[in-house]
A protein has these predicted regions:
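Polyanion-binding surface elements
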Residues: 1-23, 52
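The DNA-recognition helices of helix-turn-helix-type DNA-binding domains
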Residues: 28-29, 53
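Short amphipathic alpha-helical segments
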Residues: 22, 40-41
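Short Lys/Arg-enriched helix C-cap and helix-to-coil transition segments
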Residues: 33-38
Length: 67
């Protein structure tokens, strides 16, 4: 079984507020488990969320100019 993190623990690992994590859950941008009234986030799902937002060195967004 994967380690389940509370919203507080997930926020601490992300370095963000609990409110941000709750918004991710509400917007269904991160997978979560509901245990009664409690929300838990699997550590592997949190890691996947972090990896999905990773920007590799040397990748620049394409800028459109003019028009």
């Amino acid at each position: 079984m994967d380690t389940l993190l509370s919203v507080e623990q997930a926020a601490e690992r992300l370095g963000t507020s609990e409110r941000f994590v709750r918004r991710l859950v509400f917007e269904r941008r991160i997978a979560y488990v509901k245990l009664g009234r409690h929300v838990r986030i699997a550590a592997r799902d949190l890691d996947a969320f972090i990896r999905a937002g990773r920007v590799e060195v040397g990748q620049f967004p394409t800028l459109r100019r003019g028009a």
